[in-house]
Amino acid sequence: MNPTTSTTTTPVRIDVWSDFVCPFCLIGSLRLEQLAAKTPIEPVWHAFMLRPPGSPPMSAEKRAMIAEYTPKISAQIRDEFGLVVERGPIGASSFAAHHAMKHAERHGKAIAFNNAVLRAYWLQGEDIADHDVLRRIGATLDLAFDDAVLEGREPVTAEAVSVDLAQAQAYNIHGVPAFIFSNRYYVSGAQPLELLERAADAARGEPVAVH
């Protein structure tokens, strides 16, 4: 970031496709929090489901692979952010959480809800497929989720989730997190803070290179 940048600089919009059960999405979210402390940004969270409804049961090989890489990611999160990972159930569906997120967005609380769900799953071992868990998280933000929202039957939130998923397809987003800065720069994966900062500066029009 340019050191002369004023704190009144217009925030850079960052569209983020993310899934709550993705460890790299937790890292990406934490790095966005770090970025927000350095330069004005406006994260807009979009739904992405690594295991959409109708996915086959997770194979034993996939579960073993997740169990193998989890300690490495846990160590990275501990060393970089000082947080202890206590993961929720492997294979938990994020369907209801994404629909709840769109309800939270309508009330101006998407960022807070996103952060709360990520922390509930990754740091508190909660099952975010459990509607009672989501309702409890929502209550901390003065949000109430009825069955229609959490079951994907509420038309407005269901349409918003569908639009997010369709946009991801249109942009050829096949993995998350994925960041689009001001509709100009695309960054894929849990990249270092320095790269996100360069992307934000470039989106703002400052003379930096983004790779």
Predicted segments — roles?
Residues 26-124, 206, 210:
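Structural alpha/beta surface segment adjacent to cysteine/selenocysteine redox centers
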Residues 2-7, 11-12, 24-38, 116-211:
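C-terminal cap of thioredoxin/glutaredoxin-like
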